[in-house]
Structures are given as C-alpha cells and as structure tokens.
Amino acid sequence: MKEIIGIGNALVDALYLIENEDIIKEFGLEKGGMHLIGENIFEQVCERMRAAKRERTTGGSACNTVLALAQLGAPVGLIGKINDDENGRFFEDSFRQAGVRTFLMKDAQPTGTASTFITPDGQRTFVTYLGAAALLQASEVASQWLDGYSYIYIEGYLVQSHDLIEAVVEAAKARGVKVCVDLASYNIVAAERDFFARLLRKTDIVFANEEEARAFTGLEP
C-alpha cells in the first residue's frame, strides 16, 4: 500500500450543545456562520464555556483525511504545529494511538481550536482560533520527513503561508513524491486564485468540489 503524509492546520474540534443563543449574541456572532478569532476572544470563549459539556475530537482538513486513511489501514504521517497544552496532548495522543507517524512542531501559542455551537434548531455556528497551527514555518519542516512516502496531501487552508506550501512542494518533487492538493473552500480559492494557479501546475492530484472548481476555472460544470 502506498504511504501518504499530510500537512495542514492541526486543530481540536470542540462541540457544544447550547440551550439558547446567548453566547452567539454575546460575542456578536452570525448564527450559522464561520468566524476566525484571535487569542483574546478565544480565551474569553474558553472561560465562558468552561463549565459547559463538550464533545472533543481532532480536526483540520488534512488531519481528518490522514486519520481516516489510518483507520482504513493505510501507512500515513502528519506534519503540523500544536502547543504542549491539554488540547495539544489530546491531538498528538489521538494520532499516535491511530498509528499515525507524527511530525508536530510546538509553539507558545495555544493549540488551534474550532468551537461549534449547536442550537436546539440544529444550526451550527463555528468559531475558529488557528493558534499554533497557523504558525508552522517552512524552515521548521525537514525535507527528509518525506522520505519513504509516495504522496503528500496538502490542505488548501494552509494558503496563509505561501512559502511553506512552496517549500513542501519543492521537497516533494525532489524526492519523487506525488503532490495532492485539496482546494479547501470556494472563497479561499477565489481570494488566492493566482497562487493556486501556480501551485496546481506542480500538482499531481487535485481534490475539489463543484463550487471550488467553479471558483478556480470560472466555468460552470
């Protein structure tokens, strides 16, 4: 079986079943929307929800893909960045227990967390703090980590760091590792279309849904 290594935002998902919309209104959130927040608001959310019951899982696009492949028995690895905090240890332990070979850098910023507030009507409101995940640098990724792998899976959400993606692709090409890119989301593709156009010229396999393909090509299916 071909070996696959993924690189992406290492996140922990925290799901909360809430009885009303108080916290959504308190933080000025759009119900049903996705919101990126900074450390200050993240700390306030954590304090506000400290006593609430939550369901915690690992998250992140590439991370979810790698974990699913591991559960199917594929030999896989994962590159990302976390903090040595409770969420970071939970994240790392979860992947190691699944048999994933991890290359996880550590940062002083808290481990990235995606909080989901689910109201009684089933609507989900997302609040994401990228934290340490967004601080992975090209200089921290050792090219030899790719040795022995046939494919590298790169999530489009890493587009905040062009240098990181370009360095990883260059290292992969030098080692004969095939490059797989997930376009992540149509709005990210639209905002970074020129970069994706350059990236896909060096990509062997592209994962995109209908909306992402439309955003990239400008064409209807």
What are these regions (language model features)?
Residues 1-77:
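Glycine-rich phosphate/adenosyl-contacting loop at the front of the ribokinase-like
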Residues 1-31, 54, 83, 89-107, ...:
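Ribokinase/PfkB-type carbohydrate-kinase core domain
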